[in-house]
Amino acid sequence: SQIEQLLLIFERFGNITDHKGLQHALANYIYDESSAANVVGNIEPPTPSLTDLLHREHVQFITSLPGSWQQAITQASASLLKSGVIEPRYLQIMLDKIADEQPYIMLAEGVIIAHAGVDDGALETGMALLRLPSKIDVAGYMQADIIIVLATNNPQKHLKALAQLNEFLEFYDGGNVIRRAPDEYVLIKDFARHS
């Protein structure tokens, strides 16, 4: 089911201590989101989709390989820093986490998703994507040519976009769609078509 799929995704990003609770929360989120939106006085903004987060300013293809994986993640994060989605410390925590903890952050072959925690300097929910011309070694334990940076200051706000991204990568060969896109605008249209 959709819930089980989401649980599998979240397992990869941290230890879930209350499976039943999360399952219940996800079920409510997925099936009641539209009805919740109709409650009078509910001013909670809608949960952003993949295309809500990956605007043109947050998608960049580069033609020369950065000198290090740290530079690559810094470059991937630049638009989020510039637009005030994250503070500089969020970037530093991400880099330290990868170097020190070597978390498993590969979503698909060559595609990594770097992130820190909700209290690590994320001011709102955002996502950015950087496509490299070839794979770069990341901290000696991964090879990646597509770097996605995810930030959220709310533990639920990124779930819809993350689920859509995972589906895009898994069911539409999304990694290769990203690699083959002639430019950023075409890729954004591809995301819109599949989400």
Residue map of PLM features:
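Cytosolic covalent-transfer regions centered on His/Cys nucleophiles
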Residues: S1-S195
